[in-house]
A protein has these predicted regions:
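Conserved Rossmann-fold SDR core element
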Residues: 91, 101-116, 152-160
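Catalytic loop of short-chain dehydrogenase/reductase
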Residues: 6-7, 13, 17-35, 40, ...
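C-terminal helical subdomain
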Residues: 110, 128-187
Length: 187
């Protein structure tokens, strides 16, 4: 990682199988076991691995930011048990890693985007209300704002909502709109 990128100051961790549906309509006992395995291998394990490797470099330089992409499914049932468990694991990893890095100058956060206009969301746009959606670049602006904050360590271990960061730091989406933060109750 260090050789490929010349060092790590900031890292965003998002892992998912491209093309997967957001939720699956069948209950967990009707799900194929490979879905659970894939969710934890491509999501949780990859988050742990990338954070571990990135943290080593950041600890050496006594600074850095790791933003693990998660979602409200960590805190509320949103249609799929494996998805919710993987997001909850991501949030727990973030809190515990942040605790272990507290004295190392490295910040870890869980970052919740809103409804992101990915290719699959746009393909199925009739199923979604896109009026409060976010571009794929919006979450990147949230990370850039965090990375520019000299007091970002005070947020370490927290769950942050990208749209709330837009309001706090004063950035909008690429279309000029300011997405409204989605709350747990609305998710």
């Amino acid at each position: 990682m260090n050789n490929a990128w010349g060092g790590y100051e900031h890292m965003v961790e998002k892992t998912a199988e491209d093309g997967w549906d957001f939720t699956w309509p069948r209950p967990f006992w009707e799900q194929p076991l490979w879905r659970w395995d894939a969710m934890f291998a491509s999501g949780v394990r990859a988050t742990y691995t990338a954070s571990r490797l990135g943290a080593r470099l950041m600890v050496a330089q006594k600074s850095g930011l790791i933003a693990n992409i998660s979602f409200w499914a960590a805190q509320k049932y949103l249609g799929n048990t494996a998805y919710g468990a993987a997001k909850a694991a991501t949030d727990k990893l973030t809190r515990d890693m942040a605790h272990e890095l507290l004295d190392q100058g490295v910040t870890l956060v869980s970052l919740y985007p809103g409804l992101v206009r990915t290719e699959s969301v746009l393909r199925d746009a009739a199923e979604f209300d896109l009026s409060n959606s976010e571009s794929q670049q919006f979450v990147g602006r949230a990370v850039a704002a965090l990375a520019s904050d000299p007091q970002v360590m005070r947020k370490s271990g927290q769950v942050l909502v990208a749209a709330a960061l837009g309001q706090e730091y004063g950035f909008g989406d690429i279309d000029g709109k300011q997405p409204r933060p989605v709350t747990l109750e609305e998710a």
